[in-house]
């Protein structure tokens, strides 16, 4: 009985750790606009380097809900679109040194993806990740 309880605890901890570790190469799919998280509800965004997902630009958006009954949600997004959006916002703001460095890093990423743009690097359908499914949500409480 103790080993069963221990296995259950390990399984629960593994699920929590998997939720916290980015699994960036995931299937990007179109969402109904009512399901797209508000920019104000996003806690962090993980954008891949070109070599991470075989040249495909993927961004994983993490939305943790504040209410106890609401679960955490991951959404796989087109990384190039996320980069372009963030750059458009940053270009309109006065930037401090850290934000300026962030903007330059985004420009570097954007240029890297542009230099490798082709049929193989514009589709993330080849990635079959459970975190690319909007329906897969979990409570971390």
Curated annotation (Swiss-Prot):
Cellular component aspect of the GO annotation: host cell Golgi apparatus; host cell plasma membrane; membrane; viral envelope; virion membrane
Keywords assigned: Fusion of virus membrane with host cell membrane, Fusion of virus membrane with host membrane, Glycoprotein, Host cell membrane, Host Golgi apparatus, Host membrane, Membrane, Signal, Viral envelope protein, Viral penetration into host cytoplasm, Virion, Virus entry into host cell
Region feature (Interaction with gH): 21-131
Function text: The heterodimer glycoprotein H-glycoprotein L is required for the fusion of viral and plasma membranes leading to virus entry into the host cell. Acts as a functional inhibitor of gH and maintains gH in an inhibited form. Upon binding to host integrins, gL dissociates from gH leading to activation of the viral fusion glycoproteins gB and gH.
Organism per entry: Saimiriine herpesvirus 2 (strain 11) (SaHV-2)
Annotated signal peptide: 1-19
Family: Belongs to the herpesviridae glycoprotein L family.
Subunit structure: Interacts with glycoprotein H (gH); this interaction is necessary for the correct processing and cell surface expression of gH. The heterodimer gH/gL seems to interact with gB trimers during fusion.
Classification via Pfam families: Phage_glycop_gL (PF11108)
Subcellular location: Virion membrane; Host cell membrane; Host Golgi apparatus, Host trans-Golgi network
Membrane topology note: Peripheral membrane protein
A GO biological process held by the record: symbiont entry into host cell
The protein's name in its UniProt record: Envelope glycoprotein L
Protein's gene: gL
Principal place of residence: virion
């Amino acid at each position: 009985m103790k080993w069963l309880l221990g296995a259950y605890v390990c399984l629960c901890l593994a699920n929590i750790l998997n939720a916290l570790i980015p699994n960036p190469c995931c299937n990007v799919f179109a969402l109904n606009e009512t399901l797209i998280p508000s920019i104000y509800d996003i806690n962090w965004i993980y954008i891949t380097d070109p070599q991470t997902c075989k040249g495909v630009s993927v961004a994983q958006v993490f939305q943790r809900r504040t209410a106890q009954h609401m679960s955490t949600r991951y959404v796989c997004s087109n990384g190039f679109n996320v980069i372009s959006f963030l750059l458009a916002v940053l270009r309109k703001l006065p930037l401090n040194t850290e934000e300026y460095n962030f903007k330059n890093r985004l420009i570097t990423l954007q240029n890297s993806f542009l230099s490798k743009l082709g049929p193989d690097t514009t589709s993330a359908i080849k990635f079959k990740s459970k975190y690319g499914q909007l329906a897969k949500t979990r409570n971390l409480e």
